[in-house]
Swiss-Prot record:
Entry binding sites for ATP: K632
One annotated Gene Ontology cellular component of this protein: cytosol
Pfam families: Anticodon_1 (PF08264), tRNA-synt_1 (PF00133), tRNA-synt_1_2 (PF13603), tRNA-synt_1g (PF09334)
EC number: 6.1.1.4
Source species: Synechococcus elongatus (strain ATCC 33912 / PCC 7942 / FACHB-805) (Anacystis nidulans R2)
Keyword set includes ATP-binding: yes
Reaction catalysis annotation: tRNA(Leu) + L-leucine + ATP = L-leucyl-tRNA(Leu) + AMP + diphosphate
Upper taxonomic lineage: Bacteria, Bacillati, Cyanobacteriota, Cyanophyceae, Synechococcales
Record key words, sorted: Aminoacyl-tRNA synthetase, ATP-binding, Cytoplasm, Ligase, Nucleotide-binding, Protein biosynthesis
Motif mapping: 'KMSKS' region: 629-633
PROSITE patterns recorded: AA_TRNA_LIGASE_I
Placement of sequence motif 'HIGH' region: 58-68
One GO term (biological process): leucyl-tRNA aminoacylation
Name this polypeptide is given: Leucine--tRNA ligase
Gene3D superfamilies documented for this protein: HUPs (3.40.50.620), Isoleucyl-tRNA Synthetase, Domain 1 (1.10.730.10)
């Protein structure tokens, strides 16, 4: 590398240098240069350690928002640092391109979903390139491309062959006007269709599921391996899996040979059962309902069937029920207890039946209070008894009472003994249950990956022979009736791959999470036309070393991806247990928001005439002002294109990375954006100066050492900030400190000064790649700054020869002197006593005591007059 004063006139990779900081021109120039040089292409396997940096890929809506910019900039900075630290890096990008918005566009605008999607992909790809993100575009994947979804279908068949994909009846949202199935997001808060306005009905439909419950225990236990994940995310997944240890208990139905089977985590409370509840959909409801209760039970069941699962299980919603008139016998007490149906019991969860113990469960207590059901205490506190009637349920551990042979035991001990007794008597057995349910992947949509199954009257569901099963082109969309695929008779009609007889294709498509549950695997071998990925390549690059994405994906996407990985491992397709070593959930980008507290309406900032005293221009009401997540509905978003047009991508990146730690929410502030632009201009001017000065020999050895110490302190601090927790904001703060030190340097052109300027540019490059590339050329760089090694710390430069020593008299600071860093206690005391400060303040005084704190201060204690 050269220091050359004439570097401005140099040509670097055929690109000329401008003496004025023009971000738009610089960024366009270098983006074109990097693309031509394939600077970001992923290297083949070699002896270097690998690093796989991955951002969650976006849905191609057509425009980037600031949340995207933050996610991708964080990951890009990490990838750029790792490349220069000697890693071979995989840093890809793609598109989660199936989904409902494209189908809605087809209905509303008359465009084909594929055309709408690919147009958006092209637009967003260009926006990403404008940010200077170092993606290997040769590995781009688009989930709606047949080249991709043929492998999604192939993976589905892996599940099918393993017995992990199956069909069963499940409830869907049905629009009675449009005669079509609705996704949950198409149903408003009042339970109406967003398009027709009809009251949505709940119907049973045969659907495809994946047996994720077969992996529930492993998914739970392996969370302990994920030490690089936020504890919050691991806890969310553990709660979603929801392991419960307890028992199945069976209650014989009076006048029947059948039994009601319940699961309970509190078998110690079984003597306190005062009723049993079935889900309205439970298959035994008809049998246990008496003629007198048939009308009431049928009406209640019909009403509940139109209520969403979320509503039925909401904590703050009163629990409602109806007695069936039937009874079961509590086998432990021999007493008959009534059977009810209630809205809060779901047939899909557990056995679809629960035992009601009002004395020891809050929900049961509220239900019993509402319907006048008896409360029978069977556990008392260890110390002191609760007087009846009980004012509230006692839900903690205690001593067994009213429980026959188990009286006097601790409730904890009684659990095991009651389960053992039930097993001996044939009334129940120990059982572990999970809240997690099998994954419903069927969607009655066109714009999704077709499920590659053929339904044969003789053979049943059979795997399609030829993949991909492609979506038909030029489909007409009305938003009414069955799935568009189901209406295409020519497409549906086929022959059975097994027996050759007439058969029909599956017309459901897959949940889009199917496509995103394995895309990170495809990146390892993205262009392979013969297989989804080779075992060698996927085992080479995976697991992902750093995954970056929003907390909103903490459960479904991440859990499904973990499930996919484990199934494919068991199928022999890969050799690791978990897909993502480390996870960073970046905070939200928040915008300044104006809201009328009286009307609840949001007001756009461009309608505010006086930001210091904002009022609603329509009503004159004083507005509330606060920061909230950017969204169109709140009029608080900032268009990335506007920021790039005004300041350039490097300024946007610097602001995004500096404003807040990656995991914290970021409040958008135009003034701070301007501040980053000014900082980059300062760096620009600094390098202009450095590129013109002649190299000199330092005359002031102390100043040179101090400056070199500042340079290597910056190297140390920035490197540490970029390890493990990626504190990118404090790393940029260190660059600002170094810039100040260089601007204050007494001798521009000295070796330490020139080393410092070069180091500043090298450290700046991951954050602001375009300006760093331009400045590196001005400093005489012979190749791209992004190919240069990471600056190496010289620990000897951090050694301090002299340190400040505070002089105190009676604990009050009177001044500071400079002393050798190696001085011992006696030397420090002597230097302090001989200082001008001490001479002035101690003149005529008697020193009673001297306190020396090495490296910090000397305190003189004087005798009282």
């Amino acid at each position: 590398m050269q220091n050359g004063a004439n570097s401005r006139s140099q040509e670097y990779q055929g690109v000329s240098v401008d003496s004025r900081y023009d971000p738009q021109a610089i960024e366009t120039k270098w983006q074109q240069s990097w693309a031509a040089a394939q600077l970001d292409r992923t290297p083949e396997a070699d002896d270097r350690p690998k690093f796989y940096a991955l951002s969650m890929f976006p849905y191609p809506s057509g425009n980037l928002h600031m949340g995207h910019v933050r996610n991708y900039t964080i990951t890009d900075a990490i990838a750029r640092v790792k490349r220069r630290q000697g890693f071979r890096v995989l840093h890809p990008m793609g598109w989660d391109a199936f989904g409902l918005p494209a189908e809605n566009a087809a209905i509303d605008r008359g465009v084909q979903p594929a055309d709408w999607t690919y147009q958006n992909v092209a637009q967003m790809r260009e926006q990403l390139k404008q940010l200077g993100l170092s993606y290997d575009w040769d590995r781009e994947v688009t989930t709606c491309s047949p080249d991709y979804y043929r492998w999604t279908q192939w993976l589905f068949l892996q599940f099918f062959e393993a017995g992990l994909a199956y069909q069963k009846e499940a409830t869907v949202n049905w629009d009675p006007i449009d005669q079509t199935v609705l996704a949950n997001e198409q149903v408003d808060s009042e339970g109406r269709s967003w398009r027709s306005g009809a009251k949505v009905e709940r119907r049973q439909l045969k659907q495809w599921f994946l047996k994720i419950t077969d992996y529930a225990e492993e998914l739970l236990q392996d969370l302990d391996q994920l030490t690089g994940w936020p504890e919050r995310v691991r806890l969310m997944q553990a709660n979603w899996i929801g392991k419960s240890t307890g028992a199945y208990l069976e209650f014989p139905i009076v006048n029947s040979s059948d039994r009601v089977k319940v699961f309970t985590t509190r078998p110690d409370t079984v003597y306190g059962v005062s009723y049993v509840v079935l889900a309205p959909e439970h298959p035994l409801v008809t049998q246990v309902t008496t003629p007198e209760q048939q009308t009431a039970v049928a009406a209640f069941a019909a009403e509940v069937s139109q209520t969403s699962e979320l509503e039925r299980t909401a904590e703050d919603r009163p629990k409602r029920g109806v007695p069936t008139g039937g009874f079961v016998t509590n086998p432990f007490t021999g007493q008959a207890v009534p059977i009810w149906i209630a809205d809060y019991v779901l047939v899909e969860y557990g056995t679809g039946a629960v035992m009601g113990v009002p004395a020891h469960d809050s929900r049961d207590f509220a239900f019993a209070q509402r319907y006048g059901l008896p409360v029978q205490p069977v556990i008392q506190p260890t110390e002191g008894a609760i007087a009846e009637p009980w004012p509230a349920p006692f839900t903690e551990a205690g001593v067994m009472v009213n429980s026959g042979q188990f009286d006097g035991l601790s409730s904890t001990e009684a659990k095991a003994k009651i389960i053992a007794f039930a097993e001996e008597q044939g009334w129940g057995q120990a059982h572990v249950q999970y809240r997690l349910r099998d994954w419903l992947i069927s969607r009655q949509r066109y714009w999704g990956c077709p499920i590659p199954i053929v339904h044969c009257p003789d053979c049943g569901p059979v795997a399609a022979a030829d993949l991909p099963v492609q979506l038909p082109d030029s489909v007409q969309f009305s938003g009414r009736g069955p799935s568009p695929l189901a209406q295409l008779e020519d497409w549906v009609t086929t022959t059975c791959p097994s027996c050759g007889k007439p058969a029909r294709r599956e017309t459901d498509t897959m949940d889009t999470f199917m496509c995103s549950s394995w895309y990170y695997l495809r990146y390892s071998d993205a262009s392979n036309p013969e297989i989804a990925f080779t075992k060698d390549k996927v085992n080479d690059w995976l697991p992902v070393d750093q995954y970056v994405g929003g907390i909103e994906h903490a459960i479904l996407h991440l859990l499904y991806s973990r499930f996919f990985t484990k199934v494919l491992r068991d199928r022999g397709l890969l050799s690791f247990d978990e897909p993502f070593k480390r996870l960073l959930t970046q905070g939200m980008v928040q915008g300044l928001t104006y809201k009328n507290p009286k009307t609840g309406k949001y007001v756009p900032s461009d309608r505010i005439s006086d930001p210091s005293q904002p009022v609603d221009p329509d009503t004159g009401d004083r507005l509330e002002v606060f920061f909230e997540k950017m969204s169109k509905s709140k009029y608080n978003g900032v268009d990335p294109a506007r920021v790039l047009d005004r300041y350039g991508a490097d300024t946007a990146r610097m602001f995004i990375l500096f404003k807040a730690p990656p995991e914290k929410d970021l409040e958008w502030d135009d003034a701070d954006v301007e501040g980053q632009f000014r900082f980059l201009n300062r760096v620009w001017r600094l390098v202009q100066t450095a590129s013109q000065v002649e190299a000199t020999t330092a005359a002031d050895d102390k100043a040179e050492k101090d400056l070199r110490r500042a340079v290597h302190t910056a190297i140390q601090a920035v490197t540490e900030d970029l390890e493990e927790d990626y504190q990118l904001n404090t790393a940029i703060a260190e660059l600002m400190k170094l810039t100040n030190a260089l601007n204050d340097a007494p001798m521009p052109g000295s070796p330490a000064y020139l080393e410092g300027v070069q180091t500043l540019v090298l450290l700046l490059a991951p954050f602001a790649p375009h300006i760093a590339e331009e400045l590196w050329q001005q400093l005489g760089g012979e190749r791209s700054v992004h190919l240069e090694g990471w600056p190496v710390l010289d620990e000897s430069a951090l050694i301090v020869d002299e340190i400040p020593l505070v002089i105190q008299i009676m604990g009050k600071t009177r001044g500071t002197i400079t002393v050798p860093a190696s001085a011992d206690r006696d030397q420090l005391q002597q230097l302090a006593e001989n200082s001008e400060i001490a001479q002035r303040w101690l003149d005529g005084q008697t020193i009673r005591k001297v306190i020396v704190v090495p490296g910090k201060l000397v305190n003189f204690v004087i005798a009282s007059p």
